[in-house]
Each structure stands twice: as structure tokens, then as C-alpha cells.
Amino acid sequence: MATIICKRNRFNVVYSYYDEAGKRHQKWEAFSTMPEAKQRKSEIEYKQQLGSFTIPTCNTLNELLKEYVSLYGKTKWAINGYSSNTGLIRHYIAPKLGELRLKEITPRVLEMFYQGLLKTPAVPLMTDKKYRQTGKFVQPPTIRKIHNLLHSAFKQAQKWELIEKNPAEFATLPKYEMKERNIWDSQTLFHAIDCCEDERLKLCLNLAFSCSLRIGELLGLTWDCVDISEESIATGKAHIVVNKQLQRVNKRSMEATDSKDVLTTFPEIGLQNNTVLILKKPKTRASIRKIFLPKTVAENLTKWKMEQDFLCEKRKINLPLVIRFPCYFPKSMVK
């Protein structure tokens, strides 16, 4: 059993355990909010009932990161966040710092590590061609992600009373200037629409611009979230509801996070694929929104719906996706 004790504006989860010699000890884990403490308390009690509860006892950074991913990452990270963070650990952190004892890691050690990364070849991206030699080194934005990951891991180590201070708190990062993202102006958009000959792509451009949709939200839009009835269009109330998104995720990461927030999994084309397409819930509740459609876009959607209904009837499929894409039909969509 575990209890929660509030002390100095901190919520402490307190529980007892026995060491290998049979001696009883008391453990305190500090959290900044009551919901976090309650979640940890429930997790401890559940694992104690199953007989699978273990006390975090980490000597090296590799051991800490293993506990951190298991206890924190699997419950807090989204699927792609899990893939990204475990990749940073595997490719950059573990080879350089993994065998260091926690007491040996200081702000100076981290700063030297960050400077060394600037001269370390970057791991190729999935989108790079196979066997392509990019010749690129790890960039400051990636180093910032690594720093944030280490900061979070050391913060958890503080809560578990494995370290007294967070060394990442005082480490200085390499200079980084954020580049402004180039965006289209209205003239460029209208020119692109005029030049576009693919009706599906033209509809995507109109939806993305008029509704400010991310690509995952656009491709994850389903007809049950679209109101384009004659009455709605006539009264200016035609709208869409954004409540899910299409995403490609790593299959192992999806299994590790227990398919968290996954609504639909699309069938795989190849047996050797490491990734799979899914429909998932948005990252935050704020991403769920109702967006009213301009009349011209609503009329374009009506025309597109008629064409898609004809296709579905011809192929004997039930396809609720607004923007269809070949070969990806969930089993639940096939009659």
C-alpha cells in the first residue's frame, strides 16, 4: 500500500519495501501535482498486487533511462514521441554517456557531451535514401531535444531520490537560432490551385487553407464529421469537426505504448513493414474543434462525396474517409 503526504507544496507518495536481506525501508517519491501523485500511487498498488513492483535502483545512466522509459515514457509519451525519444537514447545518449554513474554526470560533462555531438555524424532519417551518405552532423535543434529528454529523466531521478540535483538544469546548450518557417501568401495559394489538375489535391488545398488543417487532420477527416447538407450550406452552417488524425507510426512503439489513443489500424501492404498507418485521437483536447466551411468549399465537398459514393458502390466498400488513398482500407471498412 502507498499513501500521499503533502509537504512544502509537494505531493509525496510514500510506501514501504523490503531489501534482499529482508530489512524494511520507506521510500518517498515527490510530485508537483496531486493528479501525478495519485497516478503513481495507483500504479504502485496495482503492481504490488500483481507481485511485479520493483524499486527504482539505478547506478548508471543506462539503468536510469531504462527505468525512466518503462515507468514514465510508456505512460506519458505518444507513439511517435516514444519512437523519437528512444531513438535519441539509442543513437546518441547511450553510446556516449550510458556507462557513466549518475554521480559522475555534472553540468560540465553534459556541456562537453553537447559540444561533441556537433562533430558527431547524424543518424540518417527514414526519408533518406538507403545507404545514402549525408555527411551531416548533429544539429543544435536535435541537441536541444536530447537536453530536454535528459532534463526530464534527471527530474524523475530526483523524485525517486536517486540524485540530489538535476545536472541538466545548469548545463549550457550550443547557440541555436530558430529559423522562420516560410508560408504561402494568398497569391501563391490561388496560383497553386489554378495550376492543380488533380481534383483530390485541389480539394485538399482548399480544405487545408480554409480550415487551417494539419496534414494528419486533413487525411484523417471522415464523413461522419462533415455537415454539408443543403440546409447547412444555405444557412452558412456547413462545418467539419476535427477529432482525429492520420499518422504513420512504428509498430514496436505502438505495442510498447499499448496502442494508446489509436482508433483504427490500417492493414499493412508488406509483411516486412516496420511501420503502420493509424487513425488516432488528437494530442490535446484543444486540437478538437468545429470549423465552419466557406460555401465554395462546402459545394466542392458535396461534389466529391457524390463521386466517392459512386466509387464505393462500384467496389463494394464502405469508405468513411473524406480523402481516400489507394490500398489503405481498414478491415472494418470493407463490406
Residue positions per predicted region:
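N-terminal DNA-binding module of tyrosine recombinases/phage integrases
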Residues: C6-F11, Y17-M112, D309-R324, F329
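Conserved hydrophobic/aromatic pocket- or pore-lining residues that grip, position, or stack substrates
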Residues: I93, L110, L150-A153, E161, ...
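Short, basic (Lys/Arg/His-rich) helix/loop patches that form interaction surfaces
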Residues: A122-V123, D194, D198, C211, ...
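Conserved tyrosine-mediated DNA breakage-rejoining catalytic core shared by Y-recombinases
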Residues: K7, V14, Q187-T188, L221-M306, ...
